[in-house]
Amino acid sequence: ESIDCEAYCRQYRSQLNRIPPFVVLIPSYGDIGFCWEPFDRYNRVTSRGRIAIPMYTKNLKTALLTATADLRWQVAKEKASYYWMEEGLTGNYYQWFQTQKLKGDVKEYFIEDYLVWMTKESEGIQKLEREVRNVFWRFMPFSKDIKEELKTRAPIYQELYQKDLNRQMSDGY
């Protein structure tokens, strides 16, 4: 959460509410966590989701990140409803997926890219494609401290940071 400050936040009436999910420990081995349920179907606004994590993992950070990525994907997809392929995080990522003509599950690619985003890109190591980095920077922004540090590292981050500033200035009108 120190890197992805809005990982467990949902917006309601133009206010961000932090709603951490319940963590279900599964008595198994593995490195992959997953989203059991993004939120309760009767209370989508304030209900806590459920993520499942194996008890015995080689790398707990990877298990938590895959579960968080799955939770983010499911929440964004449910929020966009019928338009999940057209708008928001899932829509923009899906459009990139289609232009690349990739095969397979979009969510699996998203989870892999989210792992790279949180482990490599947050440290300034550029591993993602430019379009994916743009989508993640816009819809899953880093904390302000990380953004300030990254803008001095590479011109691509400086450009993304400048786009953020321009977007903030235009939102005021």
Model region roles, listed by residue range:
Residues S2-Y173:
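Active-site-flanking segments in enzyme catalytic domains
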